[in-house]
Protein backbone atom coordinates (compact mmCIF):
# COMPACT_ATOMS: atom_id res chain seq x y z
CA UNK A 1 0.00 0.00 0.00
CA UNK A 2 2.88 2.37 0.72
CA UNK A 3 4.21 1.85 -2.79
CA UNK A 4 0.83 2.60 -4.35
CA UNK A 5 0.51 5.80 -2.31
CA UNK A 6 4.00 6.94 -3.22
CA UNK A 7 3.38 6.31 -6.91
CA UNK A 8 0.11 8.22 -6.85
CA UNK A 9 1.43 11.19 -4.88
CA UNK A 10 2.40 14.26 -6.95
CA UNK A 11 6.08 15.07 -7.04
CA UNK A 12 8.43 17.41 -8.86
CA UNK A 13 8.46 15.12 -11.92
CA UNK A 14 4.68 15.06 -12.43
CA UNK A 15 3.60 17.08 -15.48
CA UNK A 16 0.16 18.06 -16.68
CA UNK A 17 -1.05 15.70 -19.44
CA UNK A 18 -0.57 18.22 -22.26
CA UNK A 19 3.03 18.93 -21.19
CA UNK A 20 3.79 15.23 -20.77
CA UNK A 21 2.49 14.57 -24.30
CA UNK A 22 4.54 17.46 -25.73
CA UNK A 23 7.66 16.25 -23.93
CA UNK A 24 7.10 12.69 -25.16
CA UNK A 25 6.71 13.97 -28.72
CA UNK A 26 9.87 16.09 -28.44
CA UNK A 27 11.88 13.18 -27.03
CA UNK A 28 10.58 10.86 -29.75
CA UNK A 29 11.46 13.39 -32.42
CA UNK A 30 14.98 13.82 -31.03
CA UNK A 31 15.44 10.04 -30.85
CA UNK A 32 14.42 9.76 -34.51
CA UNK A 33 16.69 12.58 -35.66
CA UNK A 34 19.69 11.11 -33.84
CA UNK A 35 18.91 7.42 -34.32
CA UNK A 36 17.57 7.16 -37.87
CA UNK A 37 21.01 7.35 -39.49
CA UNK A 38 22.29 4.52 -37.25
CA UNK A 39 19.27 2.40 -38.16
CA UNK A 40 19.90 3.15 -41.85
CA UNK A 41 23.54 2.09 -41.47
CA UNK A 42 22.47 -1.18 -39.87
CA UNK A 43 20.04 -1.85 -42.75
CA UNK A 44 22.76 -1.08 -45.34
CA UNK A 45 25.29 -3.27 -43.54
CA UNK A 46 22.91 -6.23 -43.36
CA UNK A 47 22.07 -5.83 -47.05
CA UNK A 48 25.68 -5.43 -48.17
CA UNK A 49 26.99 -8.37 -46.13
CA UNK A 50 24.13 -10.64 -47.20
CA UNK A 51 25.52 -13.48 -49.36
CA UNK A 52 22.66 -12.96 -51.85
CA UNK A 53 23.32 -9.22 -52.36
CA UNK A 54 24.77 -8.16 -55.73
CA UNK A 55 27.76 -6.37 -54.18
CA UNK A 56 28.24 -8.44 -51.06
CA UNK A 57 31.21 -9.19 -48.87
CA UNK A 58 31.53 -10.56 -45.35
CA UNK A 59 32.52 -8.12 -42.62
CA UNK A 60 36.10 -6.85 -42.90
CA UNK A 61 36.31 -7.87 -46.57
CA UNK A 62 36.30 -5.70 -49.69
CA UNK A 63 34.13 -6.54 -52.66
CA UNK A 64 34.47 -4.75 -55.97
CA UNK A 65 31.51 -4.48 -58.31
CA UNK A 66 32.40 -6.36 -61.52
CA UNK A 67 32.24 -3.67 -64.17
CA UNK A 68 30.66 -0.26 -64.48
CA UNK A 69 27.43 0.51 -62.66
CA UNK A 70 24.45 0.89 -64.96
CA UNK A 71 21.02 2.39 -64.28
CA UNK A 72 19.65 -1.14 -63.78
CA UNK A 73 22.37 -2.23 -61.35
CA UNK A 74 21.11 -3.22 -57.93
CA UNK A 75 23.73 -1.25 -56.00
CA UNK A 76 23.65 1.96 -54.01
CA UNK A 77 26.09 3.90 -56.18
CA UNK A 78 25.59 6.42 -58.95
CA UNK A 79 25.79 4.82 -62.40
CA UNK A 80 28.45 6.34 -64.65
CA UNK A 81 30.79 5.31 -67.41
CA UNK A 82 34.20 5.75 -65.81
CA UNK A 83 34.12 4.48 -62.21
CA UNK A 84 34.34 1.03 -60.67
CA UNK A 85 32.95 0.81 -57.13
CA UNK A 86 33.81 -1.34 -54.16
CA UNK A 87 32.66 -1.49 -50.57
CA UNK A 88 33.46 -3.02 -47.22
CA UNK A 89 31.88 -2.95 -43.79
CA UNK A 90 34.39 -3.14 -40.95
CA UNK A 91 33.78 -4.42 -37.44
CA UNK A 92 36.29 -2.77 -35.12
CA UNK A 93 34.84 -4.21 -31.90
CA UNK A 94 37.77 -6.66 -31.61
CA UNK A 95 40.42 -4.08 -32.46
CA UNK A 96 41.94 -2.36 -35.48
CA UNK A 97 41.47 -3.60 -39.04
CA UNK A 98 44.44 -3.20 -41.37
CA UNK A 99 44.26 -2.39 -45.08
CA UNK A 100 47.26 -2.44 -47.41
CA UNK A 101 47.21 -0.23 -50.50
CA UNK A 102 49.60 -0.81 -53.42
CA UNK A 103 51.22 2.02 -55.31
CA UNK A 104 48.72 3.47 -57.78
CA UNK A 105 50.10 6.16 -60.07
CA UNK A 106 48.14 5.83 -63.28
CA UNK A 107 44.61 6.60 -62.18
CA UNK A 108 42.38 8.34 -59.66
CA UNK A 109 41.15 6.25 -56.74
CA UNK A 110 39.71 6.97 -53.35
CA UNK A 111 38.53 4.96 -50.37
CA UNK A 112 36.13 6.96 -48.22
CA UNK A 113 35.66 5.84 -44.60
CA UNK A 114 32.48 6.76 -42.74
CA UNK A 115 31.34 5.96 -39.22
CA UNK A 116 27.89 4.54 -38.48
CA UNK A 117 26.44 8.06 -38.54
CA UNK A 118 27.75 8.19 -42.14
CA UNK A 119 30.15 11.00 -41.24
CA UNK A 120 33.35 10.78 -43.27
CA UNK A 121 36.38 10.52 -41.01
CA UNK A 122 39.12 9.51 -43.47
CA UNK A 123 40.08 9.21 -47.11
CA UNK A 124 42.84 7.06 -48.56
CA UNK A 125 43.78 7.48 -52.21
CA UNK A 126 45.03 9.82 -54.87
CA UNK A 127 42.43 12.39 -53.79
CA UNK A 128 44.52 13.03 -50.68
CA UNK A 129 47.88 11.95 -52.13
CA UNK A 130 48.08 8.74 -50.12
CA UNK A 131 51.17 6.62 -50.50
CA UNK A 132 51.37 2.85 -50.86
CA UNK A 133 51.31 1.33 -47.39
CA UNK A 134 49.25 -0.10 -44.59
CA UNK A 135 46.44 1.82 -42.92
CA UNK A 136 44.79 0.86 -39.62
CA UNK A 137 41.14 1.67 -38.93
CA UNK A 138 41.02 2.15 -35.16
CA UNK A 139 38.01 1.68 -32.87
CA UNK A 140 36.98 4.47 -30.49
CA UNK A 141 39.31 4.81 -27.53
CA UNK A 142 41.85 2.27 -28.78
CA UNK A 143 45.20 2.79 -27.04
CA UNK A 144 47.31 -0.06 -28.46
CA UNK A 145 50.49 0.18 -30.45
CA UNK A 146 50.63 -0.21 -34.22
CA UNK A 147 53.54 -1.69 -36.15
CA UNK A 148 56.05 0.82 -37.49
CA UNK A 149 54.95 2.53 -40.69
CA UNK A 150 51.22 1.83 -40.27
CA UNK A 151 49.05 4.94 -40.67
CA UNK A 152 46.28 5.20 -38.03
CA UNK A 153 42.75 6.25 -39.06
CA UNK A 154 40.56 6.89 -35.99
CA UNK A 155 36.86 5.99 -36.19
CA UNK A 156 34.20 7.31 -33.82
CA UNK A 157 32.20 4.04 -33.99
CA UNK A 158 33.04 0.32 -34.04
CA UNK A 159 31.30 0.02 -37.39
CA UNK A 160 32.92 1.54 -40.47
CA UNK A 161 31.67 1.75 -44.05
CA UNK A 162 34.35 1.92 -46.76
CA UNK A 163 33.40 3.07 -50.25
CA UNK A 164 36.04 2.66 -52.94
CA UNK A 165 35.94 4.45 -56.29
CA UNK A 166 38.45 3.80 -59.07
CA UNK A 167 38.62 5.66 -62.36
CA UNK A 168 38.75 3.33 -65.35
CA UNK A 169 40.17 4.35 -68.68
CA UNK A 170 38.28 3.86 -71.93
CA UNK A 171 39.46 0.84 -73.85
Locations of regions flagged by a protein language model:
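Sec-dependent signal peptide recognition
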Residues: 1-2
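A compositional/structural signature for long, glycine/proline-rich flexible linkers
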Residues: 10-171
Amino acid sequence: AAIACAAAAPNALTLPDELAEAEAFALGYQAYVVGAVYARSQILMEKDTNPDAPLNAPLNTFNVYPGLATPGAAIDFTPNNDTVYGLAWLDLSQGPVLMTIPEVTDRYYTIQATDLALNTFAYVGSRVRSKAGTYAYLPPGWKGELPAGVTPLQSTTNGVFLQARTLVKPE
